[in-house]
Swiss-Prot record:
The keyword Iron-sulfur does not apply. This is ATP synthase subunit b 1. The lineage of its organism: Bacteria, Pseudomonadati, Pseudomonadota, Alphaproteobacteria, Hyphomicrobiales. The gene is atpF1. Belongs to the ATPase B chain family. GO terms for cellular component: plasma membrane; proton-transporting ATP synthase complex. The keyword Chloroplast does not apply.
Amino acid sequence: MALDATFYALVGLILFFVLIAYLKVPGMVGKALDARADKISNELAEAKRLREEAQSLVAEYQRKRKDAEAEAASIVAAAQREAEMLTAEAKQKTEEFVARRTALSEQKIKQAESDAINAVRAAAVDLAISAAEKVIASKADASAQETLFQKALGEVKSRLN
């Protein structure tokens, strides 16, 4: 066997492996790798827990948003119903007011017509009385006038009673 550089390299390599085994480097490396694996596993578990928590929060907020939207929709619908009711009530009151005012106006018109007819009749009666008075005064004597006056007075009394 030759003691050349390859032999010394092999002996150095074997001594290096023996030294590493003596110092329990593979155990330390294994422990370090196990610790690192445990840390990564814990971080993954924490990340999973946080993700689930975030998903539950998102679901809760979406549920609350849907509830709020439903409540807003019901409020809008109630407001629309109330507005329609108020509009219908206002329309009904306006129609009633217009009907009352129309009836009152018609009543006033009828009263004015009646007053005008009565005034025309009274004026016609006064004119007829005046004309009759003039005709009778010019053509009748005192006894005939007295008889006509008494007859007319009797007719007026009978119509008034």
